[in-house]
From Swiss-Prot:
Protein name: Protogenin A
Lineage: Eukaryota, Metazoa, Chordata, Craniata, Vertebrata
Domain Ig-like stretches: 27-117, 122-209, 222-309, 314-399
Biased composition (Basic and acidic residues): 1084-1106
Highest taxon above the source species: Eukaryota
Name of the gene: prtga
Amino acid sequence: MASFKRDLYLFLAVFLSISGVWSFSELFFIKEPHDVTAMRRDAVVLDCQAHGEAPIGIRWLKNGVTITESERVYSLSNGSLLISEVESRKDKSDEGFYQCLAQNKYGSILSQRARLTIASLSTFTQQPASIIVMEGSVARFTCKITATPPPIITWEFNRVTLPLATERITVLPSGVLQIQGVEQRDAGSYRCVAANIVSRRRSTEATLTVTPAMSPRAPQRPRIIAGPQNLTVPAHSTALLECMASGNPRPLISWSRADHKSIDVHKTKVLGNGNLIISDVNPQHAGIYFCRATTPGTRNYTIAAANITVLAPPSLVEWPESVTRPRAGTARFVCTAEGFPTPQITWLKNGEPVRSNGRIKMYNSKLVINQIIPEDDGIYQCEAENIQGSVLAMARLIVVMSDNRPSAPRNIRADTVSSSAIVLAWDRPAYNSEKVIAYSVHYMKAEGLNNEEYQIVIGNDTTRYIIDDLEAGRNYTFYIVAYMPMGASRMSDHVIQHTLEDVPLRAPELSLTSRSPSDIQVSWQPLSHKLSRGRVSAYRLSYRTSSDGTLTQLELSAHKTHQLLEGLQPDTTYLLRIAAATAVGWGEPSAWSSHRTPKASSTKVPLAPELQLESLNCTTVTLRWHLPAGSSSGLQGFKLSYHEEGQSEAAQAQIPPHHRQHTIGGLDPRKKYHIKLLAFSFMGDGYQADQTISTPGCVSVRDRLVPPPPPPHHVYAHSNSSSSVFLHWARPAFTSAQTLNYTVRCNPVGLQNASLVLYLQTAAQSLLVTDLEPNTNYEFAVRLHVDLLSSPWSPVVYQTTLPEAPSRAPVGVKVTLIEGDSALVSWKAPDDRSAAAVTHYTVLYATRRAWAAGDWQMLQREGSITMALLENLQPGQVYLVQVSASNQMGDGPFSAAVELTIHTDGHAHRTHGFSHATVFSDGFYHLDQRSMAGIAVGVCIALTCIIICILILACRSKTRKSCTTKSIRQAGGQTPPTAVRLANESAAESVEVMMPMMRDHFIDAKGGTNLIINSYGPVKPNIEKKRRKRWSFFKKNEKEVKKVSSPAYSYHPGTTLLCYTETSPENPPTTLQGLFGPSGGDSEGSHSSEGSHETSDSGRYSHDDTEATNVSIRSRPASLQDDGNQTPVHEKQLETTLQEQEMTDLHPV
């Protein structure tokens, strides 16, 4: 019973479809419009009557656009178009092509085209000209005019109409007047008259003058005065070939064909004396005709030739037939036409042009519709058209739909897997899903026109599929259809998804020329989307000389296609290459291209030709070029050379100067060739144009049928160590080959040097990549090789190698003594890019004796902290301090030991309050403001104490002031050690120098002014008035202070020196070092040693040349610097001398 019902349904479906075709066959045209020529203001009717199932609607189109009806132009009840008054103006004309469109419920059909032409008669384009001929010779007049319809031309002699043909006179339809055997009575005035339905026009008059003939006439060889002209004529029209010859005796005219075929005598006749007329021309009459003028009785002749081209309107040889197809089926229509020129085939659906897309394809004369949907139902027409007209044929496509068909697959999803793969997933149809026997996956590029649609059929056991043969960086459209025995479902919803970008497949081809001896013009063509594999984001142009390895690189924006390199060396060979990048990274650079700059003396030779290369096929390249303006003078030719990349350059071939094109054959497929072309003149060889081109592969059947394999899937990277990464991947699905090889690409992210890209080969599905840089982010990609085919690169994966333990110690280690038993250690992070961030620092410190015994104390600080406080230090000891950095990978090396001397209690007592010593690991001493930031509070307290002391000292007796000042001046005119400033402040910032501990008489307030303050107040040479206002509280001693200013002080701008004297020193200095600090020479120190010996100063000076100069100034008075071998002066005596000198300066006699 079920089988019977199924057969009944099929019978009804076929019957209904057949009846539908029969109903459709009733829609056709009874009358169609035809070409018409009308005069202005005439009424015109264009016929159009259609027959078919009612109701039938008719609408008109002019030049493909629907006509808007008006009182002047409107449709009649029978469908014809009436133009009551034809107009012909520049802004508004009724001329054009007209078609009518008939429509009923089955669809629409379009009529043939009809041309409406407005009759006209223009002025003459060629007037007859006066001539002088010899009696007995021939005469010929001609006139030409443009008119619609073609005019009838007659001639008048002395304003009397001539007969169209006599024994001696012939009037040709083309407007030519021929006179044979001219006589004296033929002399006179001639003019032509052209007339058609519009009007009549007369040409200007031309005079024929006849001269007497010589007696007897000398023999003359035959000469063709007016030979035949090439003709292009429509079929079924008349063709006229003129042939007029002169000679003595009168020549005989004969005709023949070049193909030796006989001339059709039934439709051919001779008009006048040798003019050939062919009536009712058809394609068989086309060909080359020879006119031969022969002297009678001799073999003397002359020949003229002309070609006749016959235009034939289109005619159908094979026309489409109506078909009935189920949903998701395929329909094919065939339409073949002939004519000349070859007709162009256009397909229409319901009167509208068919748009080619993924489902609908047009192959020459065929229309193929895949995956038919209900909307494809309609009337299809094939229109064959050329300049002679058009012809149409029609057929209907009926789409049959089954009631038991499944619904469309639901919830289609697309996810990008890689630059060439997208995975599709969907849900089964909601209706009749159990009857689904298969699915078809359809996809095509979303951008552009005429994209190919691809179809893949899979079983019903899955709702997921990976498409892995896509182009990188492209948008694709996907949809899915479900199939069951009775038919197919509707299409699913369309989804658009894009593939990932990849690095460019190759670099652009370079074109190199020079405009002068010191530049190179580099140009290139943008990469195609298939080669760029995404949007190009930048170019990198590299160049160098052939003899120098120094490489210059230029980063260029993506929109640039040329770059001028200037400032180059003349007569030098340069190597250039280019690389392109997408958002993913840089592709492989091109091979080096060489170009030699012209010699400096080559300024008058021809400039480089502008060269264009094109691959005709896999073994042939065509060169086209042209010279810049002004470079053709004196040109003697061109020189061409080419060679395959990596091969030696071949000999030059010379090309004639008038050639601008050359073909190179016999090349190898898939090879890169370097081509060089230059022009040469008598001045020498010109500038050279260099270009590279890659020949394509020869297309074979195998290339067309076998797609490239998919790339490996699931690439995974794992860091094994600081120099190795382990890679593994999965074999791509649907790859049945047994022998597979893989290429692994590895390079650092943001690579600047393409030579660092690693390419590793393996047959396994895993690889350990070694010899990598620590703590560096790398990118990896894998491609598959099978059967001489290569897959695209897999998606790029990123992995960072593990970092190393710090390989360098902290730098800038310094120790600052802030109290008698406390010191501040500070440092800077090590400069080690291969190591991870520092997690903590370790500070080791101990006395010399404990250090030697391995008994040291340790402090640890977090990686963000770069200072530590050492407390409970023992007085009178020398401490050694070292710092190291550590991270999660391990501990780094320790810095060089820094020595710090802790003073005894008595010494500390003499220091009075704040005193600091800064020690550097590199042996230099420096007052670093950043290190003082950590003890800002202490500094503020110290400054407050100093200000209080100054105010107290300002009130002391003048006797003590005089004594102090005098003692200083007698010391050789030098400022105390702490008053000497470094040569420049930048040196003080970079070369850190420890200042000796302050004595009781000298306090460095590190002010930003040039004041010198002793116990009596501020002292400044040539002090400015506005500066004195800031020290107004010292006005009572201002006069005496001015007297203190003396050359005895070594004055340095930007330094404030505070000088004071103790009221009653309990512990006077016992040595010279106690007053002036350590000696500048320090014979026991070395550049590499750090810290100081057990002395009252807190460190050792460097023996650096610049620093030694400053230190010697600080350490000794001028009286001791004159001679290094003088006997040391006792400190007590020196102090007394200085005090006496100071008293003398303050109280002059």
